Structure formats: structure tokens, C-alpha cells
């Protein structure tokens, strides 16, 4: 009796564990935050031209004429 029960459980497990069709890759839309329903700030709407980023701080060596720093 126990052997039949074990055989039945093995057969049921084999039927249930049948391979499921799935993709082996993630689509770009799933990882693109700007394509979602609530895009974060800084994302351009779809179809809009890409804006060139404006530099936040201009380069400065940290020494100006008013501070009388040594010049090279």
C-alpha cells in the first residue's frame, strides 16, 4: 500500500513539475524607469527631443585674482 502511494506521489510530482514556458531575458521596458507610468523627474516624455544637460558648476582651480594666490 505504501509503495502505491509513493508511486502515485512521484507521478503527480512529475506532472506538476512540467517545464513552464518562460523568457530567458528581461525586456528593456521593465528596467527603464522613464518608460513606466510615473517617471521620475529628469525623464523626457516619449517622443520629445533629448535636451543637452547644462553644467552645474563651471571649472575653477580654486584661486582667483582677488585672493592674491600664486600664479603659474
From Swiss-Prot:
Is the keyword Aminoacyl-tRNA synthetase in the record? no
Question: What is one cellular component GO term in this UniProt entry?
Answer: condensed chromosome
| Residues making up the signal peptide according to the UniProt record | 1-17
Select a single GO molecular function from the record's annotations and give it. hormone activity
Cystine pairings recorded for this chain: 34-43, 63-69
The protein in question is named: Protein RALF-like 11
Its domain of life? Eukaryota
Q: Where in the cell is it found?
A: Secreted
Which InterPro entries has this protein been placed in? Answer: RALF
Q: So what family is this one in?
A: Belongs to the plant rapid alkalinization factor (RALF) family.
Q: What does this protein do?
A: Cell signaling peptide that may regulate plant stress, growth, and development. Mediates a rapid alkalinization of extracellular space by mediating a transient increase in the cytoplasmic Ca(2+) concentration leading to a calcium-dependent signaling events through a cell surface receptor and a concomitant activation of some intracellular mitogen-activated protein kinases.
The UniProt entry lists the main location of this chain as secreted
Keywords assigned by UniProt, alphabetized = Disulfide bond, Hormone, Secreted, Signal
GO BP term (any one): regulation of growth
Pfam families hit by this protein? RALF
Amino acid at each position: 500500500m505504501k509503495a502505491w502511494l509513493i508511486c502515485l506521489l512521484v507521478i503527480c510530482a512529475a506532472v506538476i513539475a512540467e517545464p513552464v514556458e518562460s523568457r530567458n531575458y528581461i525586456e528593456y521596458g521593465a528596467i527603464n524607469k522613464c518608460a513606466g507610468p510615473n517617471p521620475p523627474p529628469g525623464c523626457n516624455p516619449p517622443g520629445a527631443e533629448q535636451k543637452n544637460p547644462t553644467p552645474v558648476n563651471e571649472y575653477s582651480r580654486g584661486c582667483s585674482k582677488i585672493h592674491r594666490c600664486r600664479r603659474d
